[in-house]
């Protein structure tokens, strides 16, 4: 799959990942010998010699090598000269956030890596993999929040590469990963998932600054565990223990690592940075057909489909006048006709409906608005609010000032005309610049916004 990256008016090509020519795979201290008896081959995609499968990144990998990411700097390599400050996170202050999404073998994607800025738009023709990239991000977020692998990947067969063939044990799977930057510097996470014959995580690697901090591998397929080893740097260089194969090990580390040594504290800091970067995610796809009717008064927290938009308007209008004024300005830019206010009315049966105040005594019910107007209004509200107003699961143990909310918007431009998309993108760029919110969206055509300041566009090709 070809990928190019555009930020403003500049474009660069992203080369496919692959190990440098002649460079042998690097292994870390404590790894088992390469031909260790009993190690199940992590060949989840079949025989690499099969027709049409040469070069599949899942082929021929062992438990210890499955997560090697061909291409970029090997996470098992020793830190290079001059990298010590970066490895210790000295030059990476700020809120934890994802800076790269890797789809080594996932659905249509092979060895793909997408750079993520504060506002990133994926664009490309139908079938280029925009939706699957967003699904991978959302799945990682669910795993980071402690969800089981079945909840994170509800449709596992769709995520297995189409041409992947089962191995001798009839296993197939996929592999994804990401990089989270923050106070600890870049932290890499790579996960290998077996989809067939049963769903389980068979390998995981967390690394930072050239050092492997956590590595798991499936040793005994008959048991629901993976063997985990995490960095200790004490009397023993690593600690080994079993972890469940239906949960992300990185999310479990704070419950398993005592933090007594410098090495353990480094592991905890990297794991916490990754989990915080992943957890606060809001997948939003406003459904106009569900937003038109009056809704029961509820929690005032916006759902992913924005069904309860009227209920949230009732809450937000009273809570923050400045934010509401910005929402009214956004509605004025995205809706036809004059807009003096956006509000909610309580009906006789106790339900709530949203209306636009036209300023001349006329109020237009949201049910009368077009699909594009409703989507523009709902997405504007999402960008102007925060985790307290959206149905998300933020890291409650982490101060809000250290968290970043990421909005995932598939089909961001669906139903929007070019002017509405420009207005919405401009609002998103202004909000994302503040650092408390980020947006990863998919659009069918980004030509009208690719030159907008603060907008990064990644072009996908089938």
Regions found by a protein language model. Give the residues of each.
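Conserved P-loop NTP-binding catalytic core
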Residues: 135-196
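C-terminal lobe/lid and adjacent interdomain/linker elements of RecA-like ASCE P-loop ATPase modules
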Residues: 2-4, 9, 15, 422-462
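Phosphate-binding glycine-rich loops of NTP-binding sites
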Residues: 118-156, 371-386, 427
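Electropositive, glycine-dotted interaction segments
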Residues: 194-325
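Conserved ABC ATPase signature
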Residues: 325, 332-336, 340-404, 411-421
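Pre-Walker A-like glycine/lysine-rich segment at the N-terminus of P-loop NTPase domains
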Residues: 2, 12-15, 20, 71, ...
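Asp/Glu-rich intrinsically disordered low-complexity tracts
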Residues: 22-47, 51, 55-56, 60, ...
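Hydrophobic positions in the central parallel beta-sheet of the AAA+
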Residues: 101, 405-408
């Amino acid at each position: 799959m070809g990928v190019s990256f555009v930020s403003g008016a500049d474009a660069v090509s992203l080369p496919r990942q692959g190990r440098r020519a002649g460079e042998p795979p690097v292994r870390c201290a404590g790894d088992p010998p390469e031909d260790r008896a009993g190690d199940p081959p992590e060949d989840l995609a079949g025989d690499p010699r099969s027709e049409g499968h040469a070069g599949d990144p899942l082929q021929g990998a062992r438990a210890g090598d499955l997560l090697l990411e061909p291409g970029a700097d090997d996470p098992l390599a020793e830190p290079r000269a001059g990298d010590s400050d970066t490895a210790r996170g000295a030059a990476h202050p700020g809120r934890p956030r994802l800076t790269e999404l890797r789809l080594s073998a996932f659905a249509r994607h092979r060895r793909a890596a997408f750079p993520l800025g504060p506002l990133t738009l994926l664009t490309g023709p139908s079938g280029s993999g925009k939706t699957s990239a967003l699904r991978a991000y959302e799945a990682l977020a669910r795993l980071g929040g402690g969800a089981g692998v079945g909840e994170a990947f509800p449709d596992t067969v769709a995520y297995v590469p189409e041409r992947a063939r089962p191995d001798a044990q009839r296993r197939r799977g996929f592999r994804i990963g990401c990089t989270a930057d923050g106070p600890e510097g870049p932290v890499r996470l790579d996960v290998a998932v077996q989809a067939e014959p049963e769903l389980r995580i068979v390998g995981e690697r967390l690394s930072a600054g050239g050092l492997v901090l956590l590595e798991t591998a499936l040793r005994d397929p008959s048991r629901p565990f993976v063997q985990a080893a995490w960095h200790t740097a004490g009397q023993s260089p690593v600690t080994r223990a079993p972890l469940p194969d239906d949960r992300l090990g990185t999310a479990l580390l704070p419950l398993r690592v005592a933090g007594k040594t410098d090495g353990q504290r480094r592991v905890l800091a990297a794991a916490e940075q990754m989990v915080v970067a992943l957890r606060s995610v809001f997948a939003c796809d406003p459904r106009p057909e569900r937003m038109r009717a009056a809704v029961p008064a509820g929690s005032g927290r916006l759902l992913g489909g924005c069904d309860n938009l009227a209920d949230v308007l009732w809450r937000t209008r009273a809570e923050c006048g400045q934010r509401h004024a910005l929402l009214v300005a956004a509605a004025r830019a995205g809706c036809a006709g004059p807009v003096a206010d956006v509000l909610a009315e309580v009906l006789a049966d106790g339900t709530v409906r949203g209306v636009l105040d036209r300023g001349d005594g006329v109020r237009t019910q949201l049910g009368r608005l077009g699909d594009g107007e409703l989507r523009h209004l709902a997405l504007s509200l999402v960008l102007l609010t925060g985790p307290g107003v959206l149905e998300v699961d933020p890291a409650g143990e982490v101060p809000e000032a250290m968290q970043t909310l990421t909005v995932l918007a598939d089909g961001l431009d669906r139903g929007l005309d070019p002017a509405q998309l420009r207005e919405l993108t401009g609002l998103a760029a202004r909000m994302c610049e503040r650092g408390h919110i980020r947006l990863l969206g998919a659009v069918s055509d980004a030509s009208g916004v690719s030159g907008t300041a603060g907008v990064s566009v990644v072009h996908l090709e089938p």
